[in-house]
Amino acid sequence: MSKVLIVFGSSTGNTESIAQKLEELIAAGGHEVTLLNAADASAENLADGYDAVLFGCSAWGMEDLEMQDDFLSLFEEFNRIGLAGRKVAAFASGDQEYEHFCGAVPAIEERAKELGATIIAEGLKMEGDASNDPEAVASFAEDVLKQL
């Protein structure tokens, strides 16, 4: 059994719904899962005690990538989380009208790799909440479960 932390930043509830569904699916796979809103998170050694960390963040932006405010504060301190040697995956909810649709996914993956993490699943990019594409959420969870 692995210990998995799911940290999310959500303004409208869409990313939170994805995080909650992932929590349910990964726990059903026999793993211990902690769900944490980025608004309640402190970066300092956040990943300690966890085998894997899943990060979820809504994002948008026409010219520049804009991340959800609570998550952005955490993202700016990623170097303090303790990601070296950890398994990481990213997911996001967004609006395809924006140039940076779900742009948080590649930003999170790139930064996590720079800090020594291993990306264990292709990032999940969704329009709206988990109910819009439950198969995509389930497939992402299965990919994560295979690497735990």
Swiss-Prot record:
Organism domain of life: Bacteria
A matching Pfam family: Flavodoxin_1
Domain Flavodoxin-like intervals: 4-145
Keywords attached to this entry: Electron transport, Flavoprotein, FMN, Transport
Matches recorded under Gene3D superfamilies: 3.40.50.360
Molecular function in Gene Ontology: electron transfer activity; FMN binding
Keyword Transport appears in the UniProt entry: yes
Amino-acid biosynthesis among keywords: no
Cofactor section: FMN
Family of the protein in this entry: Belongs to the flavodoxin family.
Function per UniProt: Low-potential electron donor to a number of redox enzymes.
Name of the featured protein: Flavodoxin
Organism for this UniProt entry: Desulfovibrio desulfuricans
